[in-house]
Amino acid sequence: MSLSLWQQCLARLQDELPATEFSMWIRPLQAELSDNTLALYAPNRFVLDWVRDKYLNNINGLLTSFCGADAPQLRFEVGTKPVTQTPQAAVTSNVAAPAQVAQTQPQRAAPSMRSGWDNVPAPAEPTYRSNVNVKHTFDNFVEGKSNQLARAAARQVADNPGGAYNPLFLYGGTGLGKTHLLHAVGNGIMARKPNAKVVYMHSERFVQDMVKALQNNAIEEFKRYYRSVDALLIDDIQFFANKERSQEEFFHTFNALLEGNQQIILTSDRYPKEINGVEDRLKSRFGWGLTVAIEPPELETRVAILMKKADENDIRLPGEVAFFIAKRLRSNVRELEGALNRVIANANFTGRAITIDFVREALRDLLALQEKLVTIDNIQKTVAEYYKIKVADLLSKRRSRSVARPRQMAMALAKELTNHSLPEIGDAFGGRDHTTVLHACRKIEQLREESHDIKEDFSNLIRTLSS
């Protein structure tokens, strides 16, 4: 049996799976083929369980298609493949990294997937008091399709700091949970190693600290502080734009931390290469580990967020009320929680039960503003401008891809961002049938899974229309 078998499986999996999934779950696996058994080694238990649950059938199917009745048995283990005398005895993943997902510099070794920091006995009192918010944990982060990969990547980093995906770069619009995940990682790291030095900050704080250090002739102390951390969590890295001295200092800090296997996690409101005013060498390094998007939450996740938030406040929120709010407020988690806080406050002040009519009254101005901001006309104009076509093209019978794909995108956005029915949306797009709208919505949903570009387009348009 050829020892290139796992390489064949990798090539097929890379073709079949979304690039982010392949990079996150399949690439870290190491393989060893022996005695008709293919052993797959995962860097930690979390990865092992995920791969076995989600991809076991895919891998077994490929083995059978390549080998037929002689397909090897699969075995999963945590750790690294054993060192053998024969170089061919072990096969590791060397498939080229997918573009724009996990980029590595040619002169730098690929990110390691070691088992994490060595466990050390916890001192009676931690020697360093972190500024991580203990209220933000993985347990109270509501997971959905829109943030599943980001949460999974953050969970792995918390379990394997300095090894799994370093740096981790999370990007997405305001209020989608990036900051929550930063703090959750920090809490996860300190749960495993209570004396770890974990520093969370907004990027502007880094700039302010550097300016003070320069004014006080204390730049060496500044460098020592930031390069001594076990994990550096920086929010809104886009605020480094056009701050050349800050970028220069962060560049050297970044390199020093990675060389020391110290974890870096960054967030931004946009993909690294789209951050204007930041040096290319920094943007390149941002992609050395793993880059994951967080998208606006889908309806089911919005409902779950409202129900969990209400439960945390000991408030009974009827399901139909949560659905009513979630259907109308779509842009981000912060907006949802703010609306719910207003509903709860009004209920406490008035002593009234929380019903749909009560919510409609309590959120009257917010709901009116939302309906005014997002209309089908607005969506059509925004999409046409984004794709550099005319609104008339969206309404026409033209079927060329340059028009059909934007039209499908606009229909999907209309379904996502407005309360119009499918027939109403179809009417607004040149009198099309509701089945055409349904097909468009399903097509865009499929393409968001398969195409990084379509996923980016959808997120960018959602962000534009919701701002």
UniProtKB/Swiss-Prot annotation:
Belongs to the DnaA family. GO terms for cellular component: cytoplasm; plasma membrane. Residues 348-467 are annotated as: Domain IV, binds dsDNA. InterPro entries: AAA+_ATPase, Chromosome_initiator_DnaA, Chromosome_initiator_DnaA-like, Chromosome_initiator_DnaA_CS, DnaA_C, DnaA_dom, DnaA_N_dom, DnaA_N_sf. SMART domains: AAA, Bac_DnaA_C. Residues 131-347 are annotated as: Domain III, AAA+ region. Residues 1-90 are annotated as: Domain I, interacts with DnaA modulators. PROSITE patterns: DNAA. The gene is dnaA. One of its GO terms (biological process) is regulation of DNA replication. Domain I is involved in oligomerization and binding regulators, domain II is flexibile and of varying length in different bacteria, domain III forms the AAA+ region, while domain IV binds dsDNA. Residues 91-130 are annotated as: Domain II. One of its GO terms (molecular function) is DNA replication origin binding. Plays an essential role in the initiation and regulation of chromosomal replication. ATP-DnaA binds to the origin of replication (oriC) to initiate formation of the DNA replication initiation complex once per cell cycle. Binds the DnaA box (a 9 base pair repeat at the origin) and separates the double-stranded (ds)DNA. Forms a right-handed helical filament on oriC DNA; dsDNA binds to the exterior of the filament while single-stranded (ss)DNA is stabiized in the filament's interior. This is Chromosomal replication initiator protein DnaA. Oligomerizes as a right-handed, spiral filament on DNA at oriC. It is found in: Cytoplasm. Its main location: cytoplasm. ATP binds at G175, G177, K178, T179. Pfam families: Bac_DnaA, Bac_DnaA_C, DnaA_N. Keywords: ATP-binding, Cytoplasm, DNA replication, DNA-binding, Lipid-binding, Nucleotide-binding. Coiled coil: none annotated. It comes from the Bacteria.
